[in-house]
Design a protein with these regions (language model features):
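Structural motif
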Residues: 8-14, 57-65, 107-114
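Beta-propeller fold detector
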Residues: 21-32, 73-81, 114-135
Length: 152
């Protein structure tokens, strides 16, 4: 079973062998009205679906746990935090080894989030090409990020 978030903030599920057949559809509620869900992933340690609400104009971000049956998004932690992810593609994936979320923006920014506190765990160095690469000096175009053994 595969879960996805639609442009209308609905949580849908479908079978990978029949992707045109929607098995469930529930509206997602509880996300700050100024934020858009820009990434979701299941936390391997608990099986919970996490989502990131983000406002690209202000940089305000917040982690949520999304109930698969009701679509209710419950904020993790007490307040928003700031990220500089820009307005392009955003990569979001759990690292199952250290139980942290890797976030990368189309602008090359690179973060780790803490699923327990709901806040920023670390700001890592910007993504960049290695010295000597023909693209050195350009921002790498990252559309997704994935870890091995990241399943429930």
């Amino acid at each position: 079973l595969i879960y996805a978030v639609t442009m209308n903030n609905n949580l849908i599920s479908f079978d990978s062998e029949l992707p045109g057949v929607i098995r469930s559809l529930v509206p997602i509620s509880g996300v700050n009205a100024t934020q858009t869900l820009v990434g979701t992933d299941f936390r391997p340690n608990t099986g919970e679906l996490f989502g990131l609400g983000y406002n690209s104009a202000t940089g305000a971000a917040r982690l949520y746990i999304i109930n698969l049956q009701t679509g209710v998004a419950t904020a993790v932690g007490n307040s928003d935090f700031n990220l500089e992810l820009g307005s392009g593609a955003i990569a979001f994936d759990f690292n199952p080894t250290v139980d942290r979320i890797r976030m990368e923006g189309a602008n090359g920014k690179n973060y780790r989030l803490n699923p327990i506190t709901g806040g920023l765990a670390a700001t890592d160095g910007d993504l960049k090409y290695a010295a000597g690469d023909v693209n050195v000096g350009k921002t790498p175009a990252v559309g997704s990020v994935a870890y091995t053994n990241s399943f429930i």
